[in-house]
């Protein structure tokens, strides 16, 4: 099977001798108007892939920063339809691969077939749905694959090798390695088990390995003898924007590492 659009973006970064950069930005944050400016700024500043968060009222896996951003977006009227329309209006203008990340409920309410069709028309390259079990994702995965889109797998410290290999049999794009059990959020350092989780993922998956949850600055990767193929950062970026910063200045620290 040939590499998907998302896998190719990460492989291109690897060929340049660096990990791919994958910022996460909640749709409609910090405001509906400014979101689109910051999305385009992330793209211009060198993001390889951008994960666009779909707001949901019960974000059980999100820490306080992402949960607050989601709530603000919902209060301002952000919907999956609004996200689709905005991305479609910018199709062809963004260099980065686009991934929609959110909980199952908004996608189910939208309708899987309609979602996949509209996402493809908007230039989306994949999606991440943390609460969609592997045993129940075959229909959506097939719909996405037919339009050259990936359903990204998530694994963590408690994911056994057997389960990883089950994911690996159907996974595409990249695998999202969760650095720590619990919710998203900024942390001072990475837990010692991260190296082991990354090593197990590399043994099981042939696609790139991306590390997320608790990543806030490049220095956190320095202690890893085998760094991930891609790094995902969200809470630190959202906090930076909420404090009045801009996406370009945040990305600069990562692009120049």
Swiss-Prot record:
Active-site residues (renumbered): 51, 62
Q: What reaction does this enzyme carry out catalytically?
A: (1S,2R)-1-C-(indol-3-yl)glycerol 3-phosphate + L-serine = D-glyceraldehyde 3-phosphate + L-tryptophan + H2O
Q: What is its EC number?
A: 4.2.1.20
Entry-linked CDD domains: Tryptophan_synthase_alpha
Alphabetically sorted, this entry's keywords are:
Amino-acid biosynthesis, Aromatic amino acid biosynthesis, Lyase, Tryptophan biosynthesis
Q: Which PANTHER family does the entry mention? A: TRYPTOPHAN SYNTHASE ALPHA CHAIN, CHLOROPLASTIC, TRYPTOPHAN SYNTHASE, ALPHA CHAIN
Q: What does this protein do?
A: The alpha subunit is responsible for the aldol cleavage of indoleglycerol phosphate to indole and glyceraldehyde 3-phosphate.
Assembly mode? Tetramer of two alpha and two beta chains.
State the family named in the UniProt similarity comment for this chain: Belongs to the TrpA family.
The name on file for this protein is: Tryptophan synthase alpha chain
Which species is listed as the source?
Nitratidesulfovibrio vulgaris (strain ATCC 29579 / DSM 644 / CCUG 34227 / NCIMB 8303 / VKM B-1760 / Hildenborough)
């Amino acid at each position: 099977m040939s590499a998907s659009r998302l896998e190719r973006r990460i492989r291109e970064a690897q060929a340049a001798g660096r990990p791919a950069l994958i910022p996460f930005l909640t749709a409609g944050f910090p405001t509906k108007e400014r979101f689109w400016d910051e999305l385009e700024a992330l793209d211009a500043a060198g993001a390889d892939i951008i994960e666009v968060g779909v707001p949901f009222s019960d974000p059980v896996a999100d820490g306080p920063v992402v949960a607050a951003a989601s709530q603000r977006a919902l209060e301002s009227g952000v919907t999956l339809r609004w996200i689709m329309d905005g991305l479609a209006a910018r199709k062809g203008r963004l260099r980065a691969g686009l991934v929609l990340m959110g909980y199952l409920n908004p996608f189910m309410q939208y309708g899987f077939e309609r979602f996949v069709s509209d996402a493809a028309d908007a230039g989306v390259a994949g999606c991440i749905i943390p609460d969609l079990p592997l045993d129940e994702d075959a229909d959506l995965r097939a719909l996405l694959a037919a339009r050259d889109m990936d359903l990204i797998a998530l694994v963590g410290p408690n994911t056994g090798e057997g389960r990883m290999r089950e994911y690996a049999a159907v996974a595409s794009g990249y695998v999202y390695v969760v650095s720590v059990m619990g919710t998203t959020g900024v942390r001072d350092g990475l837990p010692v088990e991260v190296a082991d989780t990354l090593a197990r993922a590399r043994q099981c998956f042939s696609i790139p390995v991306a590390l997320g949850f608790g990543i806030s600055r490049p220095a956190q990767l320095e202690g890893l003898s085998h760094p991930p193929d891609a790094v995902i950062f969200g809470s630190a970026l959202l906090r930076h924007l909420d404090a009045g910063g801009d996406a370009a200045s945040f990305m600069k620290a990562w692009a120049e590492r």
